[in-house]
Amino acid sequence: MAETQTVNPMRKLRLEKVTVNIGVGEAGERLQKAYQLLQELTGVKPVYTIAKRTIREFGVRKGAPIGVKVTLRGKKAEEFLNKVLAAVGHRIKASSFDEYGNVSFGIAEHVLIPGTRYDPEIGIFGMDVAITLVRPGFRVARRRRKKAHIPKRHRTVSKEEAMEFLKQNFNVTIVEG
């Protein structure tokens, strides 16, 4: 009897969220343009990120808005991730992965994303994209009622598992560096 090994459905990885951040470093007109751009790219209303402390050399005060970010989940996250990966040529450095299954990479100019055009009124912005991968059942540790501990073997997503997930689902090539 040849037994076929089945994969436990609770061990399969899934895309939890994609977080897109544009750090401007100052409040004002440029921050408003970044807000408008991020809203056009994602179709979701961004939130302002706030400076944690004062840095006099950069002219940043604690509590001042210095950037914008958006968190995408579900289908919107997958669609946006496909567009953004096309901008980087479906290649991600191995050093972009951490030991918890998170991946981060940057885009130098937003005009590299397919389907976007240069608008002289907005200008050009770079952005950071962070991908978070989890296993099913992780909500048990985060919910308000009846929280429960999740063992480390199920909680953590290894670097290799995250690389394999992106290779299979998004045709990503991992580049050493």
From Swiss-Prot:
GO terms for cellular component: ribonucleoprotein complex; ribosome. It comes from the Archaea. InterPro entries: Ribosomal_uL5, Ribosomal_uL5_arc, Ribosomal_uL5_C, Ribosomal_uL5_CS, Ribosomal_uL5_dom_sf, Ribosomal_uL5_N. The keyword Ribosomal protein applies. Keywords: Ribonucleoprotein, Ribosomal protein, RNA-binding, rRNA-binding, tRNA-binding. One of its GO terms (molecular function) is structural constituent of ribosome. One of its GO terms (biological process) is translation. The keyword Disulfide bond does not apply. NCBIfam families: PRK04219.1. Belongs to the universal ribosomal protein uL5 family. HAMAP family: Ribosomal_uL5_A (MF_01333_A). This is one of the proteins that bind and probably mediate the attachment of the 5S RNA into the large ribosomal subunit, where it forms part of the central protuberance. In the 70S ribosome it contacts protein S13 of the 30S subunit (bridge B1b), connecting the 2 subunits; this bridge is implicated in subunit movement. May contact the P site tRNA; the 5S rRNA and some of its associated proteins might help stabilize positioning of ribosome-bound tRNAs. Part of the 50S ribosomal subunit; contacts the 5S rRNA and probably tRNA. Forms a bridge to the 30S subunit in the 70S ribosome. This is Large ribosomal subunit protein uL5. It comes from Sulfurisphaera tokodaii (strain DSM 16993 / JCM 10545 / NBRC 100140 / 7) (Sulfolobus tokodaii).
